[in-house]
Amino acid sequence: MVESKTPPRTHKLTDPPDANYRREVWQDFRTCCLSREASVIARREVLTGRANFGIIGDGKEVAQVALARAWRKGDFRAGYYRDQTLIFALGLSTLEEFFAQLYGDPYGDPFSGGRQMNCHFATPLVDAEGRWTDHKNRYNITADIAPTAGQMARGLGLAFASKKYRENPAIGGDFSTNGDEISFVTIGDASTSEGAFWETMNAAGVLQVPLAVSVWDDGYGISVPKKFQTTKESISAALAGMQTTGDDTGIEIYTGKAWDYPALCRLYREGVEKMRSTHRPALFHIQEVTQQLGHSTSGDHRRYKSPERLAFEEEFDCNRRMAEWMIAAGLATSEEIETIKTEARKEAGEAAQRAYRGYHDRVAALRSELIACLQAVQIAHADVPALGQIQQGLEEKREPLRTELVQTARRAAWALRKKDSAAKTRLAVFIEAEMSEGDRLYSHYLMSATPNSALQVPVVEALYTDESTIKDGYEVLNACFDHNFATRPNLYAFGEDVGQIGDVNQGLRGMQQKYGTGRIFDTGIREWTIMGQAIGMAMRGLRPIAEIQYLDYLLYGLAPLSDDLCTLRWRSNNQQAAPAIIRTRGHRLVGVWHAGSPMGMMLGSLRGMWICVPRNMTQAAGMYNTLLQSDDPAIVVEVLNGYRLKERLPINIGSFTVPLGVPEVLRTGAEVTLITYGASVRVADDACALLAQQGIAVELIDVQTLLPFDLPQICLASLKKTNRVLFLDEDFEGGASAYMLQHVLEKQGGYRYLDAPPRTLFAKPHRTGYGQDGDYHSKPQVEDVCEAVYELLREAGLA
């Protein structure tokens, strides 16, 4: 039986010390004791080999129960792996669920389904069908990530969503109550040295959003003391220049002691209530935090802390200090304190044992099933002595992991690879079932599988008439965005130079003037937090289009996309989604910093969002229309040198869609298949025209999206016809051209149809040189394509 979760807070600690006040204090102290015992047990379980890794929140218990009292339904958290006490205090986890995550139990871990290590929490923001849950009537925990300060930018986005909902309460629905929701962020003091922290605090001060950042200051970053981490050895002192002076700018700064329970309750209550009305961000610098059990189970803090520091940590243990205050205030006797601690120790121990047995009892049942399979194959194949050794190895494991069962079964199958019997078939069925279950447990939900998936959006062809006008490419985008802003009140666009001038290439020209500064707006030069704004907004039901001005600058915003946005649905086990659209432009133009096409980097780091590479602005518009109907995140890389090229404007510019993962055959031919995307399409098309003059018919395919890639296998169908293939792009060697080659030849089986070695054509290994001359000698040109195609044919004696 799973124990009940902690009841939600119903009583503020503002009363005189009557029975209600005493009961609430006792509840908080009991939560602190339960959390401490959970930490002690978690460390022991790892060090004795019963769990893999433990990172815990000892020493922060009192500050976190005080913080919990400032919460209201509808609030959000973007925290990190020290917040177990807060989660217990809010009633969002039982001890058994906490330990199930520690043991890596995918069935018992409600936060990540066994995908994340312990102390990484999440609550459902969407249901299994992708429908939004009621955010405003529950406590909302966004799925944790471990990269230090990685939660900061998401927290900014969550707070910014409150600002948007306050500006337009009509779209609040189940998401917001007048934008009153606070975004609570927690971070360790040493992690405030990260650039993401400073970028977030500056952005929060500029934007004036309800971001409440609690810094747990225990004096160290693992073993490195804060004198090497923070100017003045104090993050509140270092941030003093941002502190508000009473006007509508800056941030509030509060300080408190981690062991002073009544003062912390008052600090958080007053600070947070003020924030709900003003929307001014605040830093809560919680000092003199201790860490009784060290940083994690991978080390011992006695190696780097002085005897004096260790003595301080014992004396100022927050739980001990709270107990002393309760006794001095007449709220409890020393005997009652000991009883609470003893009961907490017992309750935590029993919960840990239930969680441990919950995992291993399931494995034990599978173990019995596997042993029966092994016994059967030994009878059927007595001439395979390895089977007995394999079974013996399994039986010697007292409490094997599920993986060890699968390994054992597969090794037995390997020993039987040349045999055949009903017993072997039974073993194969066991293996197939467990491999399938493992795939379900750990590999599903990278992308949306809901009815709202981008892959389920109906295809609507672009329509043209004889009167269809010819426009510059940017005007096509302009018309698309205009339609979507008119019909989607929760749609926003922002980035550097996006607002007043309508982006540097005019795709949003006039949109701010038409739809207001609240929906289309400029940001500072801060790519990390622009991405964070998009992530947090999208998690709260808004539809952001966030701009990275040039693809070359994606590196500044890559970490939050890769670590946070791309992993969100997967790491929350399909409980959370953020359908953010990242808009950027790239490929060839002039110079090192405006001609990037790092698609290989993106393919390696952005699994979990779609990568769209339209060849022109009409295709880009159709992709935006598709994505805005879906619940998947995506990045759209527009062609930087294509905004002034002429295109026909579809009459259904706001409603036609381009399906993701479906290439388009732009030229038909029977001699060579040429596969490319983005800006290289125009290069390839010009080359095909030259080749056609020589009687060489090339089949030109624009893949349109790299993720997903060619779902209907159009490239393979072409290769079956031509038997020769050239992959073209302007990434470096081994980048997207190699990726496309692997998909077509290996995954689609295209190698079977080759009459000549496959070719890739890519950029030089250096960055792009300046001007037309630099571009010509850095990236593939029309002449390079012609020569590569001719060489393919010449080698076959066809040219």
Regions found by a protein language model. Name each.
Residues M1-A63, R69-A70, Q291-G294, S298-Y515, ...:
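Conserved acidic/glycine
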Residues E37-S214, G219, P225-Q243, R540, ...:
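Cofactor-binding active-site loop characterized by glycine-rich and histidine/acidic residues
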Residues Q576, G586-V590, H594, M599, ...:
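Active-site phosphate/pyrophosphate-binding segments
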Residues E61-V62, N140-R398, E404-L405, Y492, G510, ...:
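Thiamine diphosphate
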Residues R44-T48, R131-T142, G179-S183, W216-G221, ...:
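Gly-rich Lys/Arg/Thr-decorated short loops/hinges at beta-loop-alpha junctions or inter-strand turns
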Residues G79-Y81, A149, T186-I187, S214-D217, ...:
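Short beta-strand segments
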Residues R23-V25, F29, R50-A51, R72-F76, ...:
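Short coil/turn connectors at secondary-structure junctions
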